[in-house]
């Protein structure tokens, strides 16, 4: 049977991978969004693990709120990406300061 430590280590590994992804790929918007989603999923895994082992459902309910905010954040980020690509024909983060409107 898996213990709490197994889930926390997996969450920490996912969190570290996402932080590395954010720092190494700061030019591409798609990679940044994927790394941010992985970061939120790592936090969600820790919430669910603690909630399960403590016998409280509050952490699992909080995960649904985080997933809802993450979905809205992804939709807004992809909308900005589409506008950036239509106007500038690039998805480079450095070119985002030229958007007006």
From Swiss-Prot:
Its main location: membrane. It comes from Cupriavidus metallidurans (strain ATCC 43123 / DSM 2839 / NBRC 102507 / CH34) (Ralstonia metallidurans). This is NADH-quinone oxidoreductase subunit K. Pfam families: Oxidored_q2. One of its GO terms (biological process) is ATP synthesis coupled electron transport. Keywords: Cell inner membrane, Cell membrane, Membrane, NAD, Quinone, Translocase, Transmembrane, Transmembrane helix, Transport, Ubiquinone. InterPro entries: NADH_UbQ_OxRdtase_chain4L/K, NUOK/Mnh_C1-like. It is a multi-pass membrane protein. GO terms for cellular component: NADH dehydrogenase complex; plasma membrane. Gene3D superfamilies: 1.10.287.3510. Belongs to the complex I subunit 4L family. NCBIfam families: PRK05715.1-2, PRK05715.1-3, PRK05715.1-5. It is found in: Cell inner membrane. One of its GO terms (molecular function) is NADH:ubiquinone reductase (non-electrogenic) activity. The keyword Cell cycle does not apply. It catalyses: a quinone + NADH + 5 H(+)(in) = a quinol + NAD(+) + 4 H(+)(out). The chain crosses the membrane at residues 4-24, 30-50, 61-81. The keyword Amino-acid biosynthesis does not apply. NDH-1 shuttles electrons from NADH, via FMN and iron-sulfur (Fe-S) centers, to quinones in the respiratory chain. The immediate electron acceptor for the enzyme in this species is believed to be ubiquinone. Couples the redox reaction to proton translocation (for every two electrons transferred, four hydrogen ions are translocated across the cytoplasmic membrane), and thus conserves the redox energy in a proton gradient. Its EC number is 7.1.1.-. NDH-1 is composed of 14 different subunits. Subunits NuoA, H, J, K, L, M, N constitute the membrane sector of the complex. Disulfide bonds: none annotated.
